[in-house]
Amino acid sequence: MKFAKGHGTENDFVIVEGTGPLPPEKVVALCDRRAGIGADGVLRIIRAGELLASGEIDELAPGINADDWFMDYRNADGSVAEMCGNGTRVFAHWVRSRGLLEEDTFTVGTRAGAKQVTVHSFSETEAEVSVEMGPAQVLGVSTASMAGESFAGLGVDMGNPHLAAVIPGLTAEDLAAKRLEQPVFDADFFPAGVNVELVTPLCDGVIHMRVFERGSGETRSCGTGTVAAACAALADASQVTGHVRVIVPGGEVEVEITEDGSTLTGPSRIVATGETSL
């Protein structure tokens, strides 16, 4: 099987094309960092109509046409994920740089709906991409605990569930020293599980964030999580809209929160291509 390896702010992915089956055990094998290629997840590039015909999705969401490219995203544990912001940037970079599309602005199908992307610049190995992420839907306040520490956060639906906890007085140095592990959360509030972000308060338009992702563990970045974190940080600062620079262990991205939507802008890198027997 041919594959590529890419990342968006070091949230890394194995990229595969084609309509062949992608069972959970294959995803786990590909993402294994010792016995496989190693990644936080798998980006499967497939036409939306082909995914529908295979029965892997029940219908095409509004705005997704049968001939649109669909990001079939899988977590490292083999589970299906609704959306991945960093993955969408890498996905868009791949289809644009490999000539699968000739336009710089196009629709990417996801299980969280149609996402408009703009590839601002690209080469075979590097790109800068914006993704229209849709509205950050605030679910309310919930709590969780991690490594013996309890905290309250803002529940945010970005097509996938997030609990973004802005911790008063938390510095970037304090955040870097924290131990992240499987969180204990309110399963009634988050019945499908949750991605948990720990966030520093907004300062001069900048926040720092770390994330423990559902199905992947701690990752170097999470695109949907940066939008959820920006939303929570703005709310903590008594703001509804704004532009936030989000610094994660793997780099930084720009998030714009408006009254009716959100935009995520950041880099994509393709670092390898090859073939695997997995």
Swiss-Prot record:
What's one GO-annotated cellular component? cytosol
Looking at the UniProt record, the site noted as Could be important to modulate the pK values of the two catalytic cysteine residues sits at 162, 213
InterPro entries in the cross-refs: DAP_epimerase_AS (IPR018510), DAP_epimerase_DapF (IPR001653)
Q: Which pathway does it take part in? A: Amino-acid biosynthesis; L-lysine biosynthesis via DAP pathway; DL-2,6-diaminopimelate from LL-2,6-diaminopimelate: step 1/1
Return one GO MF term.
diaminopimelate epimerase activity
Name the enzyme's class.
isomerase
State the reactions this protein catalyses: (2S,6S)-2,6-diaminopimelate = meso-2,6-diaminopimelate
Say yes or no: keyword Amino-acid biosynthesis present. Answer: yes
Active site feature: 84 (proton donor), 222 (proton acceptor)
Which UniProt key words apply to this protein?
Amino-acid biosynthesis, Cytoplasm, Isomerase, Lysine biosynthesis
Pfam families per the record?
DAP_epimerase (PF01678)
Q: How does it assemble?
A: Homodimer.
Q: Would you identify the family this protein belongs to, as annotated?
A: Belongs to the diaminopimelate epimerase family.
Q: What name has this protein been given in UniProt?
A: Diaminopimelate epimerase
High-level lineage: Bacteria, Bacillati, Actinomycetota, Actinomycetes, Mycobacteriales
